[in-house]
Amino acid sequence: FGDQPAATEILVERVGPGQADPLPLPAYPTGEWLAEDIGGKGVLDRAQSTLVLGKDGAVTGSGGCNRLMAKVQFERSGIAITDLAATRRLCEEPLNKQEMRFFKALTAARQWQLDDATGKLTLLDNDDRVLVVLSRK
């Protein structure tokens, strides 16, 4: 029409089956875990430091002497365990030291890795240092 440029029409059509699938999220490591190593120092045989990571963000468990409660947030391979509180039972010294290492490691954790071959869960800090290695209970 006169001196106006011709209009260009672009049609876009999706090719392929179904709707676009969102990126798959990792299967977060919820469930009950038993500490096998804390800070590279192993664990006491007679004490069980446990962790239960709930799908609802609740954390419960035991340092080996005292019960713990906290909150957890996952973001892909990231983890944040916050608001950790524990009962205040008197524990013998070796167990008390292990428990304090466990609690400190949990709140310092920023990344998680799940080894498909062994099923072990490893919690790491921001510098990729291993804080805790856990197995399914």
Which sequence ranges carry the predicted segments?
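Lipid interaction determinants
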Residues: 1-137
